Amino acid sequence: MSTDISPPYSQTHVEPVNGYPSDNKRCDDSSVPAKYDDLVRNSALFWEKLRAFLGLTSKTLKVPTVGGNTLDLHRLFIEVTSRGGIERVVKDRKWKEVIGAFSFPTTITSASFVLRKYYLKFLFQLEHVYYLEKPVSSLQSTDEALKSLANESPNPEEGIDEPQVGYEVQGFIDGKFDSGYLVTMKLGSQELKGVLYHIPQTPSQSQQTMETPSAIVQSSQRRHRKKSKLAVVDTQKPKCHRSGYNFFFAEQYARLKPEYHGQERSITKKIGHMWSNLTESEKQVYQDKGVKDVERYRIEMLEYKSSHESGATASTVAQ
């Protein structure tokens, strides 16, 4: 996701950072020699030089967003260079300090990786020429810089606290079975595959929920609702269709249960891994069964609805 900033001088306010006062006079001549201190103090000059380095003198500069907010590249440039530059920040593991200058949502667990990526893409050249005061001819490519920094820090998240319980992550469901789901989750730059399962309630857990009077009342109400639901269950209603994974799970569960007696969690995880390792042709065998079961369910539901409609009509006539 990106945000159009046109012209770049729209960022007309910069808070004093590291002792540098704010000075937002517009620079009308990009050919005027500039120094690092000038870019720090003058945000308009910073944006003009950045556009020139990116070759966007006549185009709109698309500034990236992080956590739903536009990333302040000027602030990022100051925070990194004031700590010795990108190489020093990575080597000394100072990304946490840099991130502290921004108000990112707590759900972002890969902020250091994201900031490093955008710094290399947008600001690496400015640092090389204006902060390190090296000639443009000695500037290595962004890809080479990325490889070099990767060797310095094999873990892009170094210096960042580990994700805590309660963090939100994005993902999708690959398959469903009786005890849970096969899922793929995205955590920063990593893509993780696993099993999301429901832990069955044990008798000891049930006993704990009934230790207080309020728990007894709630438990009684739940039992009452459960009995009410059981009382209205239609035993003639067709059994819901199953997916290809459901057929695979049932087959493997019956095979593994004697070997892993009482280890429901282990069985579930093992079957999930087995399904993930199947080839597409092997999965297709079970998916075909799922397609047939969907058709079975459709036909049985038509018959079920037809019989109920005829029964309701007969009841109305009798009245």
Swiss-Prot record:
Specify where the region named Disordered lies, as residue ranges.
1-25, 203-230
Is Transcription one of the keywords? yes
Compositionally biased, Polar residues: which spans?
Answer: 1-13, 203-220
> CDD domains attached here?
ARID_HMGB9-like, HMG-box_AtHMGB9-like
Q: Name one GO cellular component term.
A: nucleus
Positions of the DNA-binding region: 238-305
Q: Name one Pfam family in it.
A: ARID
Respond yes or no to whether keyword DNA-binding is given for this record.
yes
Highest taxon of the source?
Answer: Eukaryota
Instruction: Spell out the subcellular localization from the entry.
Output: Nucleus
Q: Where is the ARID domain?
A: 40-131
Which UniProt keyword terms apply here?
DNA-binding, Nucleus, Transcription, Transcription regulation
- Cite the GO molecular-function annotations of the record: DNA binding; DNA-binding transcription factor activity
The cross-references to SMART domains, in alphabetical order and at most eight, read: ARID (SM01014), BRIGHT (SM00501), HMG (SM00398)
What residues form the membrane-spanning segments?
A: none
Expressed, tissue-wise, as follows: Ubiquitously expressed.
- Chief place of localization: nucleus
Any idea what job this protein has?
A: Binds preferentially DNA with A/T-rich content.
| Protein's recorded name | High mobility group B protein 10
The organism named in the record is Arabidopsis thaliana (Mouse-ear cress)
